[in-house]
Curated annotation (Swiss-Prot):
Residues 18-37 bind DNA. Coiled coil: none annotated. Residues 1-58 form the HTH lysR-type domain. GO terms for molecular function: DNA-binding transcription factor activity; transcription cis-regulatory region binding. This is HTH-type transcriptional regulator CzcR. It comes from Bacillus thuringiensis subsp. konkukian (strain 97-27). It comes from the Bacteria. InterPro entries: LysR_subst-bd, Tscrpt_reg_HTH_LysR, WH-like_DNA-bd_sf, WH_DNA-bd_sf. Belongs to the LysR transcriptional regulatory family. PROSITE patterns: HTH_LYSR (PS50931). It holds the Pfam family HTH_1. Keywords: DNA-binding, Transcription, Transcription regulation.
């Protein structure tokens, strides 16, 4: 078993097919297929299910992936320890939820100060970003927090006011039972706050419609499709234009914190240390 075999296994697991993995790694497909078969023979167990749509991990394959991710992360960190220079450089893989109002300022400031760092940004929901940080797929991520996890350390980024957004100027709480809720998929912090509020009020929403893009949610509200709950900064432009109306909600549910997370046991590169310093410089509380 060679390090290259583990890299091939990880790529096939992530991409879901031999052809996509071969393209990502710049290998011929037959080489990838052979390496996977050799790995399965060596471990005496099938690691993938083969089907028309590609390949998915078996239970043993999922177990294998946990170890492979850790091994390859350790190898990367070993390289970083010896190659890390005083001047931040290299690749920094960062995840983020879609509504971090301070993110453009943080990224712009960081890039101007450390132009040799290649920032890779990936959008996602809080729960999936936590998982990807734990799996070493991301160096860190901006999520809705705070959270408690023994393997994660977190840094305050911002606190914002949450607003209920509707098409109509007037709103009554009973409308939750007659109007669809427009939300992100499960794993979104704003959705969790909204669902907790409704549960405490004993209200059952008429319908929940899930979206992947914030602007689609807000534009749908503006067209009268439903109502949503988002940070005030995310809807300010539409509210100012009179296309939607914002309503305060009970204080218990009315704010959301954004935190930056990373694995506690990850090697602290100069690039990451400088990124955390930049976050600290731009930390703010926006509750106006």
């Amino acid at each position: 078993m060679e390090l290259r075999d583990l890299q091939i296994f990880q790529s096939v697991a992530d991409q879901g097919s031999v052809s996509s993995a071969a393209k990502e790694l710049n290998y011929v497909q037959s080489n990838v297929t052979t390496r996977i078969k050799q790995l399965e023979n060596e471990l005496k167990t099938p690691l993938f299910y083969r089907h028309k749509r590609g390949m998915t991990l078996t239970a043993e394959g999922r177990k294998m992936l946990v170890y492979v991710n850790k091994i390859l992360q350790d190898v990367d960190e070993l390289k970083q320890v010896f190659l890390d220079s005083e001047t931040p450089s290299g690749i920094l893989k960062i995840g983020t939820v879609e509504t971090v109002s301070t993110l453009p300022t943080i990224l712009s400031s960081y890039y101007k100060s450390y132009p040799n760092v290649d920032l890779s940004l990936q959008a996602g929901l809080t729960e999936e970003l936590i998982r990807e940080v734990l799996d070493h797929q991301l160096d860190g991520a901006f999520i809705s927090g705070p959270i408690k996890h023994p393997l994660i350390e977190q840094y305050d980024v911002s606190t914002e006011k949450l607003m209920l957004v509707t098409q109509n100027k007037a709103f009554h709480i009973e409308e939750f039972t007659t109007t669809p809720l427009l939300v992100f998929n499960q794993g979104c912090g704003y959705r969790s706050k909204l669902e907790r509020w409704l549960k405490d009020e004993g209200l059952l929403p008429k319908r929940i419609m899930e979206f992947n893009i914030l602007e689609t949610i807000l534009n749908s509200v503006a067209l009268g499709l439903g109502i949503t709950l988002v940070p005030q900064s995310a809807v300010h432009h539409l509210s100012k234009a009179g296309k939607v109306h914002c309503h305060a909600i009970p204080e218990k549910y009315g704010s959301i914190s954004t935190v930056f997370i990373r694995r506690k046991d990850s090697y602290m590169t100069n690039s990451m240390r400088s990124f955390l310093k930049t976050i600290e410089e731009h930390h703010h509380i926006n509750m106006l």
